[in-house]
Amino acid sequence: AKMYKARAVFSSLTPLAPRVCGGERFASWLVRSNPTIRTSKAIAGVEPARRFASKVATEPFLNGSSSSYVEEMYNAWLQDPSSVHVSWDSFFRNSTAGAAPGFAYQAPPSLAPSYNQVPLGSLLPALGGGSQVGQVPVNEKARGHLVADLDPLGIMRTDAVHTHYAARKGAPELVLRQYMLGKIRGHHIAKLDPLGINSADLDDKHPQELLYSYYSFGKNPRTTYSQDLQYRVAALMKKETDMDRVFKLPSTTFIGGKEKSLPLREILRRLEGAYCGHIGVEFMFINSLEQCNWIRQKMETPGIMEITNDEKRLILARLTRATGFEAFLARKWSSEKRFGLEGCEILIPAMKQVIDKSTELGVESIVMGMPHRGRLNVLANVCRKPLNQIFTQFAALEAADDGSGDVKYHLGTYIERLNRVTNKNIRLAVVANPSHLEAVDPGVVFETMHLSDLPDYTTHGTIHIVANNQIGFTTDPRHSRSSPYCTDVARVVNAPIFHVNSDDPESVMHVCKIAAEWRATFHKDVVIDLVCYRRNGHNEIDEPMFTQPLMYRKIKNTPPGLDIYSKKLIDEGVVTPEEVKDVKEKYEKICEEAYTNARQETHIKYKDWLDSPWSGFFEGKDPLKVSPTGIKEDTLVHIGKKFSSPPPNAAEFVIHKGIERILKARMEMIESRQVDWALGEAMAFGSLLKEGIHVRLSGQDVERGTFSHRHHVLHHQTVDKATYRPLCYLYPDQAPYTVCNSSLSEFGVLGFELGYSMTNPNALVCWEAQFGDFNNTAQCIIDQFISSGQAKWVRQSGIVMLLPHGLEGMGPEHSSARLERFLQMSADDPDYFPPESEEFAVRQLHDINWIVVNCSTPANYFHVLRRQIALPFRKPLIIMTPKSLLRHPEARSSFDVMTEDTQFLRVIPEDGAAAKSPSNVKRVLFCSGKVYYDLKKARTERGLDDKVAITRVEQISPFPYDLVKQEAAKYPNAELIWSQEEAKNQGSWTYVQPRFSTALSHSRDIS
């Protein structure tokens, strides 16, 4: 028989079918084509077997490939109906009773609910039910005949399946299966809010399928049968005899420990304790059975949350320090903004628990990004920043260093110390961050999560602690998010989420321990939602009663977490009231001594707050001396040929024909001692790799290049994911080269690269925008971190931003990298001409906040990249990179301007006919970037080569006053013009105009 015809199995099924099959295989009979029912009456000419109207041809699970299994089930059922699953039992009973196609099969309690039933789905595997035939919902009309246990045809109705199941398994066990769903939805009814006025999920309604005490009895007219069964089961549960019955525990739970069976009452008590107490855990969305079972074991194992008395005393001591620190600041500086941690003091013991456990598991360095709330407390009690340095920030003292500094609750620090709990050394860094709360993570929250498992961006597990004070300045959470929890974004990366009540310190410590172990075990993100409150306003002088009167009335009547936990330990006999008082007084004395020392300070030292120190980098270096950037020609040739050659196993590694042409063209350029833009970049990268400098290039499409010019990764044309990276194989002992296509994010990715550049000064870290105008979606990183990071936080960074820029006649989009914005944020005085000296150029670079260049030649691009590493300090470098020049025949450089004794040219002077007779020059055009080639072409077309000089300003900021002055002096009779392709209020004009006047001592005008 044709197997596909199995789907027509019930089209001719009759009540007599199984009986008349005799010795014929039932499964074969089901799937064979057009079965004919033969009986003695049929042979005698009695009318054929009755057929049933049905919207479906057969049950969806019946097909030829399942015939052996169906036969096995059927034979077992014939021997003993109870030996098969209840769903098979009901199916065989219904089919023998003559059920029409689509009605023989009734979904068991473990399958999805039918139309109009409680949408529990996988959340309620024990009680979902109803028939769903061929994915067509059973409507109310179809249910109409299912009134009694058996309909007139003898077909078992939907509820009868459940009742039959309950009879075999026992109603209390059915309830157990239901209640075990606490591990899925128990967090909805967990007691998470320390104030007891809100639900952490913003829903005050408790899911009835979890709370058996909430079930009502009787059946409403619109109640489905599966709901009705729930009511009956709930009623059965209330019988004490059922609650004391002992049940065998399934293998999927750890609540029994060494016990294999427990009374139902104890089962429910343990499940409530594990999932519905002060901890609510979301993890069943994780698509790994191993990881889910790991969390179950950490939550369900009896006694797993018990801790020793010494551990309780440690929690008390840490909580006392956190609370005492805020109280001391409030007493000494009552009117100062400090964004205290009152209401969430448990954050300090929580972070220390994470650090302790992580250190025990082998972690040596921990980097923390956080908002301003609680930052001072973290610096004091987690990092152990000297208290006198913190208290000095409250005094209006002058700075001993250059820079603007920043408010105290934005500052970071770096500490190396011994962890006394594990007796291991640990490096702790709190990264400075403005009030853009999520920026330091980096990026907006979703971007941070999105980067977590990308190969070139993963940290192999980040522990996210949310200080969830249930309010944002004055905004209610119901107006600030659409999801139930503020942590729901973590679901997209399969990160487990632990919600915990901050007024239960021991539960918080348990969750933190699990989080550290999870990260160490699975190298994945994990989230701790610390549900707390904010005892004061947004800051200490803000009045919260204006907007949250009910909440703050409750807060005023809520004792601090320290008082609650102290009382608990006193009641347990762990500590005495005298011991609690003694711990408080000792820390108070420590604060007073630090306060006395702080009052003796006369200056603030910004360097004390450096979050990313570079050990030994600045030692033994002349701060105003730059190493040469030119290299040997042999090195240029070697790198160029390696970069321009196909993979070594070219016979096996098939590259694209277009790539072959590109490689051939590059090789021809090398033979002629020339480079284009892509070759110049590759030679800069390769030469740094040779010198042991790690190079990292990141951004959207950087492996190929937005304009298909780079091709740093070659792809096999017939083997998926087989690649070759030529710059990784230049020298056997070279530094690593990382080129990575990023996610479609600028904010998060640029922030990541900035952080990467901060960790190691001996690395060239480049971020390239797909188009220059895309940098504006990372504006926060540019404004708050890159342009001002050193002034605010004494932090240097050598990050390079590559921004494709140029008006190519393709419309306004993707044309401008907004050069004017970067120049506007350059920190130099347009009216100040620095004293000229041999170190003039380097001193300018040292004093500026960042460097902005618009190169017009591959050689200058080569040199400026190498100069980033040659400098004895680090500054961000902003490069307006070209688009049309990538393949422009004139935009090429000779090896002669890249070899030894050559360097970056801040200004490229005129070297043509005009330079030979400068007194005859009528006009000098100063310009920057690719517009030079347009001007040069127009000059030649008009025959003005000897009348018009064109000077290129390659480095716009810091402005080359000395060289501009020299160039202008060459042409005393010429009119000075600044030429740019951008509009007057864009580009460089507004920046260079006053600086030209300063360079020329206001003696000549430039227009």
Enumerate the predicted regions with their spans:
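Conserved internal helical-beta-strand scaffold that buttresses enzyme catalytic cores
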Residues: 4-455, 459-463, 468-482, 488-489, ...
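Short helix-loop-beta junction
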Residues: 488-494, 760, 900, 936-951, ...
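Structured mid-domain segments that build the active-site/substrate or prosthetic-cofactor binding neighborhood
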Residues: 496, 501-558, 565-581, 946-949, ...
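Acidic, metal-coordinating catalytic cores used for nucleic-acid/nucleotide bond scission
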Residues: 505-507, 534, 773-775, 956-957, ...
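Long hydrophobic segments that form regular secondary structure
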Residues: 576, 900-951
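Short active-site-adjacent structural elements
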Residues: 706, 775, 810, 888, ...
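Generic long, charged, amphipathic alpha-helical segments
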Residues: 733-739, 932, 937-973
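C-terminal structured "cap/appendage" subdomains that terminate the fold
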Residues: 964-1007
